[in-house]
């Protein structure tokens, strides 16, 4: 038997807190911070120092039971229960990621993303906030009926109605989880909840007990945990564990923490929480200071065994911890972490591209792992080194994360059945024969223009076509653009609104401006253009262009996407797609207080 020095130090609040407490207790013979770090490094401490710790604990009114800190103690066997080297990946792209401005997805789009997340190997898929709106409930329920391997989860406040809606929504899933939360920081309890700490604990316990009526897999989150008082956190976490919570999530809701503090916080909290060794501890970090991934990794060092993250780091404000960076950090630096995930890393880039296509959020070229430049080398010295031996300048291979995914998919001679089968392989399932026929017709048109069609082309094509399937939408029909040097470009465009054909013309400072003005001359939406961007779907001059348009009106922000080998046609499609969402997709009546954790 051996003492767990890390837990022992954490019991006193961490290295710095312990050093200060020892100095106050015995100023002349106190151990220094450096000495305490050495205890942790060696995994042992002198008997004389152990006696001082015992005396310190007694002076604080909490006698030290050394049996609780023996390595073989039952409370430390969490490693055996949850496989200490196995990290659970909890993907919240469909819930927290969707809270990015304009990133709202349709039910069909969410199902496509969920299928890809299951293919990626995400252990938990947080499909949404079922009580937020009827649309959210339908999407969570549809995903619960679709996903068979991953656990499907719904978020809910610590309110009975929310929890019961979540329970009903995830009911069809073979593996289901309810994730309930309440704020625990002093500022949130006083100003947002207007509740006393005792009331917050009572609400949390009640919430967990109701959730257990629907599933044995219940996660509890302490919103704004990293700004909460740790003794109160230990109390509320202990109470919900006793009530039946199986995962405890500690969110850095406002991205306030820094890595070494995060690690210490987790160590101390786990040590102080009654029955803390009987649950999985989870980290949910936001990126306001650019430290979400670093804090997530630090939490794992501190004892967490679940991380909550999103594809491409998508999320409101500065985003969330990105799943691709966490997974590859654990894989590449296995020598330091010794931790494993169940992620198929070759699906990382396909997942990134799909989420980017559907949400309209392009990936920055220098983004780690999934950026277009992630494996590019401009320096001649670097290029020479990589050619001679890849590992001179690359710590992982492009193929290992799926950059070989530009696979030749289909050709102009491919038939309808081959097309349907390929869509199924990509996780794309169209709801009707009409939708399949429309998508296949678009594919044949594309095949006549483009010799090689890749998986990415099909994702872009289907996303574009699905947006046109709604009868209550703006639908692109055709356009003619006239430009001449020195003259204002003119756009003549034909489009449909609820099946009624409209014609419009306008001139502008450029062809894009002319297209937008022509559409607005009929639509009169009153929206403001926030973002217009164009990206090539694949390489080559005949590649499809994927265009994103972000429109804002009042407090609503929407993204529209269009894809075509003709960039100006893609531009018109994207603008019409955004207008469809703005005009015909009702704004979600979010439940009050249903913000991010």
Swiss-Prot record:
Superkingdom of origin organism: Bacteria
Region (2-isopropylmalate synthase): 87-349
SUPFAM superfamilies for this protein: 2-isopropylmalate synthase LeuA, allosteric (dimerisation) domain, Aldolase
One GO BP: L-leucine biosynthetic process
Cellular component, GO annotation: cytosol
Keywords per UniProt: Amino-acid biosynthesis, Branched-chain amino acid biosynthesis, Cytoplasm, Leucine biosynthesis, Manganese, Metal-binding, Transferase
Cofactor(s) the record lists: Mn(2+)
Record GO terms (molecular function): 2-isopropylmalate synthase activity; acetyl-CoA C-acetyltransferase activity; manganese ion binding
Pathway(s) the chain acts in: Amino-acid biosynthesis; L-leucine biosynthesis; L-leucine from 3-methyl-2-oxobutanoate: step 1/4
Family recorded in the similarity comment: Belongs to the alpha-IPM synthase/homocitrate synthase family. LeuA type 1 subfamily.
Assembly with partners or alone: Homodimer.
Protein name: 2-isopropylmalate synthase
Taxonomic source organism: Neisseria gonorrhoeae (strain ATCC 700825 / FA 1090)
């Amino acid at each position: 038997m051996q003492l767990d020095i890390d837990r022992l130090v954490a019991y006193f609040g961490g290295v710095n807190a312990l050093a200060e407490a020892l100095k106050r207790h015995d100023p002349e013979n106190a151990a220094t911070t450096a000495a305490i770090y050495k205890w942790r490094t060696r995994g042992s401490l002198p008997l004389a120092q152990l006696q001082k710790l015992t005396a310190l604990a007694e002076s604080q009114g909490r006698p030290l039971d050394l049996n609780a800190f023996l390595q073989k103690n039952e409370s430390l066997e969490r490693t055996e229960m949850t496989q200490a080297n196995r990290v659970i990946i909890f993907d919240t792209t469909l819930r927290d990621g969707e809270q990015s401005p304009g990133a709202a997805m349709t039910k069909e789009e969410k199902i496509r993303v969920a299928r890809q997340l299951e293919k990626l190997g995400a252990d938990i898929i947080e499909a949404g906030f079922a009580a937020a709106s009827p649309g959210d409930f339908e999407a969570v329920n549809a995903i619960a009926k679709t996903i068979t391997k991953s656990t499907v989860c719904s978020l809910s406040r610590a309110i009975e109605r929310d929890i019961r809606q979540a329970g009903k929504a995830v009911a069809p899933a073979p593996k289901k989880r309810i994730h309930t939360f309440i704020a625990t920081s002093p500022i949130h309890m006083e100003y947002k909840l207007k509740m006393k700490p005792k009331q917050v604990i009572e609400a949390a316990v009640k919430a967990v007990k109701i959730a257990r009526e629907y599933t044995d897999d219940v996660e509890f989150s302490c919103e704004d945990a990293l700004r909460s008082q740790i003794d109160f956190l230990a109390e509320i976490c202990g109470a919900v564990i006793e009530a039946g919570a199986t995962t405890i999530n500690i969110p850095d809701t406002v991205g306030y923490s820094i890595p070494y503090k995060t690690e210490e916080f987790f160590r101390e909290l786990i040590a102080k929480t009654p029955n803390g060794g009987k649950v999985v501890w989870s980290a949910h970090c936001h990126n306001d200071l650019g430290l979400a991934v670093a804090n997530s990794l630090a939490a794992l060092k501190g004892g967490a065994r679940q991380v909550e993250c999103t594809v491409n780091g998508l999320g409101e404000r500065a985003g969330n911890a990105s799943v691709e960076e966490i997974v590859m950090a654990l894989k590449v630096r296995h020598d330091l972490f010794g931790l494993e995930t169940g992620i198929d890393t070759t699906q990382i880039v396909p997942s990134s591209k799909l989420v980017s296509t559907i949400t309209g959020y392009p990936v920055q070229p220098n983004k780690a792992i999934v950026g277009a430049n992630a494996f590019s080398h401009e320096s001649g010295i670097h290029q020479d080194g990589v050619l001679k031996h890849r590992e001179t300048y690359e710590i992982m291979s492009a193929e290992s994360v799926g950059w070989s995914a530009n696979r030749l998919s289909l050709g102009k001679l491919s038939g309808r059945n081959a097309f349907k089968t390929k869509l199924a392989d990509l996780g794309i399932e169209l709801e009707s024969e009409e939708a399949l026929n429309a998508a296949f017709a678009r594919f044949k048109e594309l095949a006549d223009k483009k010799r090689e069609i890749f998986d990415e082309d099909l994702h872009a094509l289907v996303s574009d076509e699905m947006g046109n399937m709604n009868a209550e939408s703006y639908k692109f029909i055709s356009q003619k653009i006239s430009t001449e040097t020195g003259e204002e470009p003119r756009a003549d465009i034909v489009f449909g609104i609820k099946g009624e054909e409209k014609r419009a013309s306008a001139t502008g400072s450029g062809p894009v401006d002319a297209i937008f003005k022509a559409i607005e001359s009929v639509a009169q939406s009153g929206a403001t253009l926030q973002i217009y961007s164009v990206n090539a779907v694949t390489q080559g001059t005949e590649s499809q262009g994927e265009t994103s348009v972000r429109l804002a009106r009042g407090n609503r922000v929407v993204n529209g996407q269009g894809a075509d080998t003709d960039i100006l046609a893609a531009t018109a499609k994207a603008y019409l797609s955004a207008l469809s969402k703005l005009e015909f997709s009702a704004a979600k009546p979010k439940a009050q207080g249903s913000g991010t954790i």
